[in-house]
A protein has these predicted regions:
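Periplasmic polypeptide-binding modules associated with outer-membrane biogenesis and secretion
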Residues: 1-174
Length: 174
């Protein structure tokens, strides 16, 4: 006969629910399972969820050792998805990574990507609030002891070709 109820699957589901709650700022969330046998072949699984206090963002700071990027981060601060008074939300942090890397690319930092935007979340000073430090830094090259910097690129000269010029140019390349 097929197995309908699996205790391990129920515990795994409880762990997934707890993990989801933590991404929404409920860092002390607990989820337990309770099963009841109603009939011979019928089981009811209840998930008891205690969310705890949902953390609120008290402070957001932006930091980059490159002065030009630091100035841009300060300029873009008002566009941030992370706002004082909002609940902590991992989706907003991911959106913030994407926003910063896109803005940097639009400013000529071609190699900017979401993985250069890091977060330090401090939950130690208050049980209900947290502070977030948004840091932009390049990964350090293991062969080089100097700090890596993000290179800015400029497009100096360009020429617009009409379709026929482009067609002739492409044929010439072959």
């Amino acid at each position: 006969p097929p197995e309908i109820y699996d205790k391990n699957a129920a515990q795994q589901t409880a762990a997934q629910i707890a993990a989801l709650l933590k991404t929404k700022g409920c860092f002390n969330a607990t989820v337990t399972t309770d099963t009841t046998c109603v009939k011979k072949n019928y089981v009811v699984a209840n998930y008891n969820v205690t969310t705890g206090m949902r953390r609120i963002i008290d402070e957001v700071e932006f930091l980059c050792r490159q002065q030009e990027i630091q100035a841009l981060l300060e300029e873009w601060k008002s566009e941030s998805f992370l706002k004082k008074g909002d609940y902590y939300d991992q989706e907003k942090m991911t959106a913030e990574q994407n926003r910063i890397s896109t803005n940097l690319k639009n400013q000529g930092y071609y190699y900017a990507s979401p993985d250069i935007v890091h977060f330090i979340v401090d939950t130690t000073y208050d049980s209900q609030q947290l502070s977030i430090l948004v840091s932009v830094r390049m990964r350090r090259n293991l062969n080089d002891s100097t700090a890596a910097t993000l290179q800015k690129y400029h497009i100096d000269n360009f020429e617009l070709l009409d379709f026929l010029q482009l067609f002739h140019f492409l044929i010439f390349l072959q």
